Structures are given as C-alpha cells and as structure tokens.
C-alpha cells in the first residue's frame, strides 16, 4: 500500500512496507475503540500534520472509514484561526500542536496585560485535573477559582479552538502531564497513544471516559503487546509492518518470531 521511511534517529532511515491490510484492519478496529469520538453525528477534524507522517496517513484513512469530515491546514501559524473557522469536534495531532495552542493563548494574554491571570488560571486547571484524575475531592476554594477561571479564561480558549472540541488524540512523542492536565480541565480530553511507523501509527491509545494522563492507554483490538525481559516493548498484530524495503538484515534483526522489537522501554501498570 505504501512505503514510509522512519525518522532515522538511531541510524539511517529505513523504508517500512505497510500494506492495505495494515491500514484497513487497524482503522476498522480503531474506529470501534474510539467510536465515542469518530462515530458521533457531525464528527469532524482538522489535520495539521503532513501526510508523509504515518500518523496523518493513518488518521486520513480512519476518517474515511468512519465517515468523518476532514480538513487540512499545513501552516501551523494559521492554527488558531483555522480551528476557529473549521470548528472541529476533535483533533489528532502531535504534542507540539497542543504546545502551540497553549503558548499562543499565553502570549495573547501577556500582550493584553493579563499574563498573570492566565498563569494562575493554568495552574488552577492543572491542580484541579490532578484531583479529578486521582478521584480526590476538590477543595472548596479550588473549585470556586476553577469555576471563575472557566468563565474568564477556559471558555474563551475553548471558543478560540472552535467551541466544539471534546477530544484530542496525541501521538509521535510524549505529551507531558502538565499539558495533559491543562487541556483536560478546560474540557478537551487528550487521548495519548503509542506507536511507531512500523506499527502503522497506534498500537495503544487511551479511551474516552477512561483516559489516564501520563499513560498511553490499553492495547488496541487486533494488536498484541508484551514486555521483554530487558523491558523492551514488543508488538505483533494487524498493525505491524511487513519488512524494511530492500533491507533483509534490518528486517531480521527487528523481529523475535512474530514480535516486532520496538527499541523502546515500557511497562504495564495494574490496569
């Protein structure tokens, strides 16, 4: 179906052979796992990532499979204006996009002489989310400040993002708990996932209503994940690539039987 080269961060880039089956099966399974996001009436999303990236290519196919309205805006400088006009119901992006949204809002507040208010509101949002995620009772004064900042700050940021976004899926790099908590509190649940070019993008992803900030969620249907004795993450299933293009030595070294050796270290938690 396609040939996508790895980033080459640990050596020369290698061409990953990904098949129609990789994309179709993973899209079908992901659409079911994320049905609260992609099957919602009027679902739409705006992509900022080049389709040379496996994540954007996978999402494009997922959206066709799920019947999602999809827009493209390659110029990240036009990010907020594009969100405001397109009004997506969810976003799929890399962490730098969420960082840009946050930084743009902070810079706008600073320019308007409201930088201190924004920073205090951001701190309140992050602390509030931590209480909620941990199932602890939110202190009265924190709850009061949160409701006040929701009217003064958070609601305006939601409106700047189009006013309809409930979920966002983040991949390709760690999001960072601070950003995750901030967006969670303002009403945008970021579902962080894990995957590589070799796994057609996602192997795991947090699910709506069950997301845990700082984790990459459960394994997607049709995918298997195990942790080797040395802590390395290994993946098998419908998402795993066929081979490295014209590089049988690298292909052989990348597999332990049917298991693809990611080169990343990970662990399972109690869930």
Range-by-range predicted roles:
Residues 20, 175, 181-189, 196-214, ...:
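Active-site loops of AMP-binding adenylate-forming
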Residues 219-271:
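Conserved ATP-binding/catalytic segment of the ANL
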Residues 21, 96, 173-174, 239:
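Alpha-helix/helix-capping structural signal
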Residues 6-9, 45, 50, 91, ...:
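Conserved S/T- and glycine-rich ATP-binding loop of Class I adenylate-forming
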Residues 24-47, 51-151, 164:
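Conserved AMP-binding/adenylation subdomain of ANL enzymes
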Residues 1-27:
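Conserved AMP-binding A3 loop
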Residues 126-192:
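Non-catalytic, charge-rich alpha-helical accessory subdomains
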Residues 26-32, 100-105, 169, 177-181, ...:
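Adenylate-forming
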